[in-house]
């Protein structure tokens, strides 16, 4: 597999078996090397999440991102006892305080900090330090344009516990942020600062 390819999946709950089948086929096609995760974006219940995971052989997914709403650490604690797939949580959290129970209680494996949502690089670095103290990696969320991308890249270079940075430049998701006709001045690195 060269590059990243995306696939739009149905968003109804009937998609659980279809998505599990698709994930198994993708894993078979790409082998065990590349990381494979599914982001349900809070669309499932706890029983649906368990059903989804149980439809796949162990090791199909490297992580499962936010299958249920993240307002309730207790719900994630329950889910944690029912599945063995690593969880990625936090892309919508707006402060270190929202991350604290998920990190302190071991409810997430990959911390999905979003520099823009969490309030900037200083707060993101505090989340990174909290995660590092529990031997957790960051997988920063980056859904926005080039300025957010540059800030997220700075976070990834500054934090010692980053596993991957999300970059969304696929044809199905490109919102025009990188179109040089619309944004002729693109972010670039010039020394140790963010320059746009």
Spell out what each predicted region is.
Residues 14-28, 44-57, 75-80, 98-104:
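Distinct, well-ordered alpha-helical segments
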């Amino acid at each position: 597999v060269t590059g990243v390819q995306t696939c739009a999946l149905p968003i109804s709950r009937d998609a659980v078996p279809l998505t599990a089948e698709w994930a198994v086929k993708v894993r078979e096609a790409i082998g065990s090397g590349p990381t494979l995760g599914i982001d349900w974006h809070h669309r499932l219940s706890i029983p649906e999440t368990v059903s989804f995971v149980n439809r796949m052989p162990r090791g199909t997914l490297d992580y499962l991102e936010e299958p249920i709403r993240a307002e309730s650490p207790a719900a994630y604690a329950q889910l944690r006892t029912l599945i063995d797939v690593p969880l990625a949580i936090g892309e919508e959290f707006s402060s270190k305080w929202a991350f604290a129970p998920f990190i302190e209680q071991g409810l997430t494996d990959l911390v999905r900090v979003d520099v823009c949502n969490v309030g900037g690089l200083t707060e993101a670095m505090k989340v990174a330090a909290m995660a590092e103290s529990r031997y957790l990696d960051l997988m920063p969320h980056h859904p926005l344009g080039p300025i957010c991308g540059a800030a997220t890249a700075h976070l990834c270079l500054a934090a010692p516990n980053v596993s991957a940075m999300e970059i969304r430049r696929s044809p199905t998701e490109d919102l025009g942020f990188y179109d040089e006709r619309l944004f002729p001045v693109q972010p670039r690195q010039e020394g140790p600062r963010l320059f746009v």
